[in-house]
């Protein structure tokens, strides 16, 4: 029987951005006779510098996401039976055809050496995925001892030991353990294993019945346990006597710990026995990526650096990817690899997606506890989607909410523009454009003194700054350019809505606005081109409380404001930071 077919809506949206005839591959999850397509790759014929093909790309996917089909965009020629040979997840591979002009989608399953059309294609969104699946982030440290540069051989042996089941898995939030030999644990489902009726385990400020944390990824934490001793009743122990071999010779030895950080996408109804196999597979994928990282280093350098795993989710991508870089490599040193990933995944070549700063933040990460990311995502949307004249532009990507009294620093009454500037800098950091730290008030003041904008007594003062100074600091510290919009009254701010709409659609950066003695951050605009009605999505830096998302949303510290929000007798300047063109 042919499987049921589900396709993530992000896949279709990404296909719309491909303007030429190409072939590629599909990747998805097969569970309970339902194939869910999550992503695709493109066959790149001229990428000779970095060897990333459809099979190695699968290693970057969470475990349980496999190569599942073939993709044709536009007019293509390819022998389908030959193309299906690398697909193991199903006996009925998927053939997916997308036509540009009509945005037509045709899907076929390859059954008994014939293509059978799929009549019912269920297009789903990310929230639908999370109703059935959850990410599991498995981490641990594996000891390695290498001699005379045999690192690849040692990694292969380590992978074989892992695959043979010589590890255990711990779920710390529930104090639950999973082993290869489950004599004492009945074969329960993942949902039962995690007991998901318990309070949300991520951000401490987000508890049961409250808003979910925004801008971060929620994943189940798991740890790797190494088996130190053998099973007491193992046949190996009964039949074999210990043997000690002593060889005296000179050799070079290196000892280190291999850091494992890997992902799985598991169905809540998956049995614990199957789950163990999936988690083992995730470790093996991670080790293979680490092997490739070391092999690439051996070809280009005599100095070896440990491999570090990072997880990424490009904007509108729909799922996570794992990428391994040599520890300490700069963005310049990883550029060729990142460019190849952009090409094979059909991503924009003018924006960075896989720099260190682009790595996702998890709810369980310690740094997430002290700051909120993208609080506007928690606002209930009530847009009139049927109104074709209403246009909406929203900040693109991640930012951190900076406001009064953070960092144990009292700037209540004078530091609002400083905090808005910090929010903007956080956007550039989280999009991978810079690794410059978030500037403190003192650093901002020193910068303005150094460029000659302020006198020396400005440092350590409580003097305000405005949008002009914000632009100076951005240009000086980050090297980015800005544009400035001016409104002589609060009513004129609404007249600049088309300019703001264009900014958010093209640049996507937060906008700092200053008027009178107040500064705010504009995150978006909702504009009706016919009636002129406009609303502004405002992030207010004057908030003095803790990082409590429900309070921030319900009390209006982050929310949509009408044109009456702006004072009629105030003069306003807006600083519109520009997005660099780079990868």
PLM regions and their residue ranges:
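Active-site nucleophile-adjacent alpha helix/oxyanion-hole segment immediately C-terminal to the catalytic cysteine
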Residues: 2-44, 387-460, 475
